[in-house]
């Protein structure tokens, strides 16, 4: 093969690939493609200096990365405002028409996958970046080059950002999970997770094997001169990108609603997962004039599909025991596919819920799955009962340790402090990030430690040695030493972390900080009156704390002696400033970690809380501020961005 023949062969292979992967219209056989592919490969092996960047051989993932570097987007990747029904759409249209009444709309599917930004320079794919925080994402160019529907080169020489969603088709998702099942690997929960996980593989050959598909939905930085978004997108598709299964231009609410209803009805027939329809103002000039809010473009909205409901059957009701001993019922149902996710469990909340809804084993029920929330039973189909249904009897003994349960009405509790489920969940909580943040103490390792007899309580963790850990399956010297080092690093922790790690019912992070600041190690001898006098600590919290200390005093003292948590320094009275004595909520991504900003505000005398209410004085918001920002605006709470917050501090 000569160089001219090689160039033509690459062009032909790319044409074959385009018809097969983008148009779904094969124009040759696998045999012809494979033969030509190997001829190109042979030429490239002996002429490395001639290898073209858009050669299909350059797609094959065979390199292992040590990690991904960060890269900025040329222009921000925005999130969209959501509406969930026709009333929500009407309200959005009214707002939009106030900005410009002479507009039309472009409607397209809202794909349920992983967002991706492609940057082309001089017609070549130069960077592929995950969405990240909208400003900066992870650079995954090598992995993305393995996606057949991403052109390595395009007939457009100016720099351009092409945004889209990476998805896995439903049938491909089933094949991947079947393979993982055979190989004894954990199954992916849904196609979205599979797509996101596949994109971020350090070994790009794994990405290549997953048959990912890239579907463009817009552009970022560009120098295109089209007057309409619909025209701009047709141009993008003409560059070799896959078209959506459905798109339309609409004049008004009625046309948009008709397109939405059709798309919603047919959603199961599309090869990829969809979770709604995106509506955008079609006129580019109007988009520019409308601009953006803090969070979203004003010219676009995501019209979400309704939550999905399915009928299934309750096979059994099992009990789960948490770290505090609370026993929770869970319904095991016939495996049911809801929008690409196989549901096998549904929450029952508590035993009163079972009685209220008269839920029985073998009942036919309607379950609802909304977003990533655990499915719940919304209706029992009593008219379908045939006599095989079995009433569920309220349990009296713990399903794990068989000790007698304490019946508190709505709540049932196991009081056995050595109950396996309580111990395991207590250790997991003890090691979690808001507590002692001990790396390497995940569920499986904690279970292995407990089942081996090495750890029967939190205190036992600190009796572990290298020799003991090496007796466990899967533990080699490095892994064992890393765990011992992590346990050692927990010593000398902040006192509030120690209090929080005890897992006292009703005593969370905020209360732990309050109690630690007030009493330090003296919290163990504090009286009820002293505890209730603390800001934000009520009667129920005080009683829970005192009962925990009564039962676990010896364990608390042992842990305190082992960990030697640092006594809180007596914080000097903060000088007068706008945040002193104020209730503050943080939301969104900021220039520094949320913990650092929280610590700074607390040093100024602010009380940083997790939820917005009428009592909230300030909401500090960053990029992609969520529902907390919206609630604050509704309640009239003063909202400050990070720069405004710092300006207030400097002016004080």
Swiss-Prot record:
Enzyme class per UniProt: ligase
Family matches, as PROSITE patterns: BRCT
EC number(s) stated in the UniProt entry for this protein: 6.5.1.2
GO process annotations (BP): DNA repair; DNA replication
Domain BRCT: 574-652
Keywords (A to Z) from UniProt: DNA damage, DNA repair, DNA replication, Ligase, Magnesium, Manganese, Metal-binding, NAD, Zinc
UniProt keyword Metal-binding present: yes
Binding, Zn(2+): 398, 401, 414, 419
Function statement: DNA ligase that catalyzes the formation of phosphodiester linkages between 5'-phosphoryl and 3'-hydroxyl groups in double-stranded DNA using NAD as a coenzyme and as the energy source for the reaction. It is essential for DNA replication and repair of damaged DNA.
Name the record gives this protein: DNA ligase
Lineage: Bacteria, Pseudomonadati, Campylobacterota, Epsilonproteobacteria, Campylobacterales
């Amino acid at each position: 093969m000569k160089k001219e023949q090689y160039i033509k062969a690459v062009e032909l292979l790319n044409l074959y690939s385009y018809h097969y992967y983008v148009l779904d219209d094969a124009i040759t056989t696998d045999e012809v493609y494979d033969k030509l592919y190997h001829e190109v490969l042979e030429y490239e092996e002996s002429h490395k200096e001639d290898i073209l960047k858009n050669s299909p051989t350059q797609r094959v993932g065979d390199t292992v990365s040590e990690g991904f570097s960060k890269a900025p987007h040329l222009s921000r990747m925005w999130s969209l405002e959501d509406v969930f029904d026709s009333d929500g759409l009407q309200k959005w249209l009214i707002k939009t028409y106030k900005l410009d009444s002479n507009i039309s709309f472009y409607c397209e599917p809202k794909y349920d996958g992983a967002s991706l930004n492609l940057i082309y320079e001089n017609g070549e794919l130069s960077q592929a970046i995950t969405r990240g925080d909208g400003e900066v994402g992870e650079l995954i160019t090598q992995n993305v080059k393995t996606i057949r529907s991403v052109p390595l080169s395009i007939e457009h020489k100016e720099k351009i950002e092409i945004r889209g969603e990476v998805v896995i088709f439903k049938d491909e998702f089933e094949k991947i999970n079947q393979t993982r099942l055979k190989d004894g690997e954990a199954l992916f929960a849904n196609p979205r997770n599979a797509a996101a996980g596949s994109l971020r593989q350090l070994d790009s050959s794994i990405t290549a094997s997953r048959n990912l598909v890239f579907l463009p939905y817009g552009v970022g930085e560009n120098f295109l001169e089209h007057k309409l978004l619909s025209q701009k997108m047709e141009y993008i598709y003409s560059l070799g990108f896959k078209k959506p299964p459905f798109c339309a231009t609409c004049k008004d609410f009625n046309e948009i609603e008709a397109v939405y209803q059709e798309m919603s009805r047919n959603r199961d027939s599309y090869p990829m997962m969809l979770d709604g329809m995106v509506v955008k103002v079609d006129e580019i000039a109007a988009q520019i004039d409308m601009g953006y809010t803090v969070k979203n473009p004003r010219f676009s909205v995501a019209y979400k599909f309704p939550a999905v409901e399915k009928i299934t059957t309750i096979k059994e009701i099992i009990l789960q025991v948490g770290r505090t001993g609370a026993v929770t019922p869970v319904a095991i149902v016939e495996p049911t596919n809801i929008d690409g996710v196989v549901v096998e469990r549904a929450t029952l909340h508590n035993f009163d819920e079972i009685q209220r809804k008269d839920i029985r084993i073998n009942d036919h029920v309607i379950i609802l799955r909304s977003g990533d929330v655990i499915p719940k039973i919304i209706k029992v189909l009593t008219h379908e009962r045939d006599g095989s249904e079995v009433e569920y009897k309220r349990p009296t003994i713990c399903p794990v340790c068989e000790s007698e349960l304490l019946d508190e009405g709505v709540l049932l509790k196991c009081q056995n402090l050595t109950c396996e489920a309580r111990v395991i969940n207590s250790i997991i909580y003890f090691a979690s990030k808001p507590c002692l943040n001990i790396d390497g103490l995940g569920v499986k390792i904690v279970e292995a430690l407990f089942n081996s007899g090495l750890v029967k309580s939190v205190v036992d963790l600190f009796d572990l040695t290298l020799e003991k850990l090496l007796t466990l399956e899967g533990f080699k010297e490095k892994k064992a030493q890393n765990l011992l080092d992590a346990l050692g690093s927990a010593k000398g922790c902040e006192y509030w972390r120690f209090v929080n790690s005890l897992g006292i019912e009703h005593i969370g992070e905020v209360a732990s900080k309050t109690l630690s600041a007030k009493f330090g190690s003296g919290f163990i001898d504090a009286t009820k009156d002293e505890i209730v006098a603390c800001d934000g600590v009520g009667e129920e919290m005080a009683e829970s704390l005192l009962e925990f200390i009564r039962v676990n005093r010896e364990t608390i003292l042992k842990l305190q002696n082992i960990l030697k948590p640092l006594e809180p320094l007596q914080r000097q009275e903060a000088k007068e400033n706008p945040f002193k004595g104020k209730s503050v909520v943080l939301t969104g991504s900021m220039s520094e970690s949320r913990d650092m900003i929280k610590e700074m505000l607390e040093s100024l005398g602010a009380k940083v809380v997790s939820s917005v209410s009428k009592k909230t004085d300030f909401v500090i918001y960053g990029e992609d501020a969520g529902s907390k920002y919206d609630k604050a605006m509704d309640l009239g709470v003063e909202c400050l961005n990070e720069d405004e917050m710092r300006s207030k501090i400097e002016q004080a």
